[in-house]
Amino acid sequence: GKTLAIDGLAARLNFVNKGQAWVVRRIEALLPVVQDAEARAMLEEMRRSHQANIAACEAALGELPAD
């Protein structure tokens, strides 16, 4: 996919993080209008998972050697 076409690990992680952040924003926009408790719980868990992935990518980026 698009991620594999990006050269360099740091650039790939930044690209993935942008996508993860976009998903978090979309979920946060949807949550106020979701009435179904099960759907809401699933979206909240998905948001937490994406936020954890963002944090993990940021930590990995912080450990990469400088270019």
List where the protein language model places each region.
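Amphipathic alpha-helical coiled-coil segments
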Residues: 53-64
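Acidic/histidine-rich alpha-helical segments that form the ligand environment
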Residues: 1-49
